[in-house]
C-alpha cells in the first residue's frame, strides 16, 4: 500500500483494487499496525491506542470495531479467528 | 513550417487528400476533411500552429467529413472519425469545426495514458504554473482565456498533462472553446483577442474558439513546473474569495478530477501526492475577471519572493 498523511487525514492507495481510500487517524493506525504481520485484535487495539497517545482502554470498543469492520469491508484486512491480518 | 505557410488551396488539398499533419504540443495529428467550410476556418484559426516533420508519426488520425451513402443526401451532416471509427452521432455540417475540436479532446482524454490527464486548465509565468482543476461550467476556460491575454502563457484550457517521469506539465495550447455568455465577456475584456465565429445551438450551446496568443503556441514544447492548484468557481455577482485549501482536500479534488487516475494505478497516486505536496492550493470564487486576474498576479509575484 502507498500512504500519504496530511494533518489528521490519511490517504491510502490499495494496489490490489486500484482504489484510493481516505481514513481518519484511528483507522489508518489500525492498518499500519498490521503492516508487519497478523496480530490479535487486542494487540492491534493496544498498539493503536499507544500510537494515538491515549491510555489502554481509552479507544472505545465500538470505534475500534467499526474501524476494523470498515477495513474488512474494503478488503484491506481479514479476520483469522482471533487475529487480524492485512489481506 | 506553420499552417500559415500554406495557401488556402494547399491546405484544402491536404485535408481532402492524405491529411493535414499538425502538431499540438506533445501530439501529432493528421486531420482529413472534405468540407470546404471546415478548410476555410482551419486555415484561419490554425494559422500559427506548426506542421510536424515529414517523417513524424501521427498519434491520432482524425477526420471530419460528410457521411457516405444515402445519409449525405438526406441532410447535410458531418461525422467525426478517428482511426477509421466513428464514435459519435453525426453533427450538423455547420458544427463541423467544434465537432472536430471536441473529437481531438476526446482522443487525448481516452488514449493518452502515457501521461496523467487532469481535467484542468493551466497557465504559466516565470517558470511556475497554476493548474485550475474544475468541472464544466465553473469558468475555468474563461478565467484561463483572461489570464493568457494578461501576460500568462497558456498550457491548456482543458488538460493538465503531467509527465510521469518528472511531474512536469506538458503544454497543449489548443484553441479555447468559449461557451455562451463567456464569449461576450472575453470580447469585452480583451477586444484584441482572436475569436472565431460563434456556432449557435451546438450540443454545448453557443461556442466560439479563441486562438491562444502566439507566444503560447511557439513555446508549446516548453514544459512547466506546477506551483499552485486553484479551484475556480464563477458565481454571478459574488464577491471574490480566495482561500487556502487543506492538502488532503486538494488531493481528493485533483485525483477525482483526473481523466485516467484509475488507469495509471499507483503512478497516479504518486504523481498527485507529489504535486499536492509541492503546490499551494486555493479555492477561488469570482464574478469579476479583472479582480480574479489581479489576485492571481499577486499570488505569482508573492511566489517569486
Predicted feature residues:
Chain B
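Charged, amphipathic alpha-helical linker segments immediately N-terminal to NTP-binding catalytic cores
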Residues: 57-107
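Post-Walker A alpha-helix
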Residues: 143-144
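Pre-Walker A adenine-sensing motif
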Residues: 111-125
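Conserved lysine of the Walker
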Residues: 140
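Cytochrome P450 catalytic domain signature, combining two hallmark sequence patches
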Residues: 50-53
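Short Gly/aromatic-enriched secondary-structure transition segments
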Residues: 45-48
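Glycine-rich, often acidic-flanked micro-motifs
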Residues: 2-41, 57-59, 121-135, 149-305
Amino acid at each position: 500500500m502507498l500512504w500519504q498523511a496530511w494533518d489528521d487525514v490519511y490517504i491510502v492507495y490499495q494496489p490490489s483494487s486500484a482504489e484510493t481510500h481516505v481514513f481518519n487517524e484511528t483507522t489508518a493506525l489500525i492498518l499500519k499496525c498490521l503492516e508487519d504481520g497478523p496480530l490479535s485484535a487486542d494487540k492491534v487495539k493496544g498498539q493503536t491506542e499507544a500510537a494515538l497517545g491515549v491510555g489502554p482502554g481509552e479507544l472505545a470498543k465500538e470505534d475500534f470495531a467499526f474501524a476494523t469492520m470498515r477495513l474488512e469491508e474494503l478488503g484491506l484486512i481479514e479476520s483469522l479467528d482471533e487475529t487480524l491480518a492485512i489481506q | 513550417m506553420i499552417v500559415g505557410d500554406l495557401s488556402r488551396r494547399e491546405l484544402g488539398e491536404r485535408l481532402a487528400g492524405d491529411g493535414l499533419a499538425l502538431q499540438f504540443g506533445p501530439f501529432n495529428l493528421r486531420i482529413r476533411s472534405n468540407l470546404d467550410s471546415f478548410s476555410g476556418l482551419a486555415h484561419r484559426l490554425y494559422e500559427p500552429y506548426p506542421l510536424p516533420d515529414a517523417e513524424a508519426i501521427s498519434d491520432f488520425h482524425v477526420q471530419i467529413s460528410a457521411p457516405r451513402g444515402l445519409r449525405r443526401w438526406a441532410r447535410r451532416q458531418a461525422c467525426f472519425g478517428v482511426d477509421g471509427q466513428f464514435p459519435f452521432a453525426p453533427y450538423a455540417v455547420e458544427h463541423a469545426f467544434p465537432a472536430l475540436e471536441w473529437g481531438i479532446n476526446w482522443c487525448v482524454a481516452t488514449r493518452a495514458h502515457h501521461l496523467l490527464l487532469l481535467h484542468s486548465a493551466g497557465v504559466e509565468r516565470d517558470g511556475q504554473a497554476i493548474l485550475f482543476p474544475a468541472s464544466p461550467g465553473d469558468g475555468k476556460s474563461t478565467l484561463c482565456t483572461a489570464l493568457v491575454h494578461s501576460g500568462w502563457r497558456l498550457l491548456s484550457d482543458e488538460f493538465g498533462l503531467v509527465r510521469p517521469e518528472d511531474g512536469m506539465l506538458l503544454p497543449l495550447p489548443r484553441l479555447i472553446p468559449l461557451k455562451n455568455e463567456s464569449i461576450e465577456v472575453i470580447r469585452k475584456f480583451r477586444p484584441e483577442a482572436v475569436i472565431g465565429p460563434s456556432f449557435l445551438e451546438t450540443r454545448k450551446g453557443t461556442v466560439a474558439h479563441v486562438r491562444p496568443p502566439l507566444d503560447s503556441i511557439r513555446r508549446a514544447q516548453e514544459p512547466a513546473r506546477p506551483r499552485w492548484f486553484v479551484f475556480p468557481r464563477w458565481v454571478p455577482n459574488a464577491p471574490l474569495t480566495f482561500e487556502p485549501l487543506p492538502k488532503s482536500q486538494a488531493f481528493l479534488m485533483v485525483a477525482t478530477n483526473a481523466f485516467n487516475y484509475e488507469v495509471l494505478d499507483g503512478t497516479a497516486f504518486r504523481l498527485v501526492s507529489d504535486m499536492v505536496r509541492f503546490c499551494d492550493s486555493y479555492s477561488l470564487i469570482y464574478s469579476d475577471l479583472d479582480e480574479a486576474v489581479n489576485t492571481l498576479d499577486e499570488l505569482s509575484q508573492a511566489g517569486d519572493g
